[in-house]
C-alpha cells in the first residue's frame, strides 16, 4: 500500500467528504430531478400554491369575504364550511364559538395580499388567517388554480 493511503491525514480529509456526498447526493438528485421534470412536463412546482384558512362569525360574513377574494383574483376557489366549533383563550377567558371556516386556494405569492384584504373587511379584532403550502395534488386542478390567480 502506498504510504499516503495509510496516513491519518489522508483519511481525516477523505471521510468527511465521503460522508457529505453520501448524505447530500440523494437530496441533490431529488432537487435536480424535480426541477428537470417540472421544466420538461410543465407540471406543478411544490409549494407555489397555498391553502389558506379563515374563520368567520357567520355565513353572511364568510360568503362576502369569499366572493371578495375570488372577484379580486386573490383566490381561485373558496370553500365555505359551516358550523365548526372553535375553542380558544381570549383575554384570559376560555371561549367556545360556532364559526364558519373558509378554505381558500391561492398562489403562495398572494397570501400577503389575501391576508390584508381579509383584515380590512373582517369584523373580528384579530382574525384568523393562516396558510399552508400545497405540496402536491391533482395536476389539472392545481394548474387551474394557477391559471385563475395571476402571478
UniProtKB/Swiss-Prot annotation:
Q: How does it assemble?
A: Homotrimer.
Q: Does the keyword Signal apply?
A: yes
Family matches, as Pfam families: CutA1 (PF03091)
* Residue runs in coiled coils: none
Which UniProt keywords are listed?
A: Signal
State what protein this is by name: Protein CutA homolog
Disulfide pattern? none
Residues of the signal peptide: 1-36
Output the GO biological process annotations, alphabetical, semicolon-separated. response to metal ion
Q: Name one GO molecular function term.
A: copper ion binding
As for family, the record states: Belongs to the CutA family.
Organism in which the protein naturally occurs: Xenopus laevis (African clawed frog)
Its gene is: cuta
Amino acid at each position: 500500500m502506498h504510504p499516503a493511503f495509510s496516513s491519518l491525514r489522508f483519511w481525516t480529509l477523505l471521510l468527511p467528504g465521503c460522508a457529505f456526498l453520501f448524505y447530500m447526493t440523494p437530496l441533490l438528485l431529488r432537487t435536480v430531478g424535480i426541477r428537470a421534470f417540472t421544466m420538461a412536463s410543465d407540471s406543478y412546482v411544490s409549494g407555489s400554491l397555498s391553502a389558506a384558512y379563515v374563520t368567520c362569525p357567520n355565513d353572511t360574513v364568510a360568503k362576502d369575504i369569499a366572493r371578495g377574494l375570488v372577484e379580486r383574483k386573490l383566490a381561485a376557489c373558496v370553500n365555505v364550511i359551516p358550523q365548526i366549533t372553535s375553542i380558544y383563550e381570549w383575554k384570559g377567558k376560555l371561549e367556545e364559538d360556532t364559526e364558519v371556516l373558509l378554505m381558500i386556494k391561492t398562489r403562495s405569492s398572494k397570501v400577503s395580499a389575501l391576508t390584508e384584504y381579509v383584515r380590512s373587511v373582517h369584523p373580528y379584532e384579530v382574525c384568523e388567517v393562516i396558510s399552508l403550502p400545497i405540496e402536491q395534488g391533482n395536476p389539472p386542478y392545481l394548474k387551474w388554480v394557477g391559471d385563475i390567480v395571476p402571478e
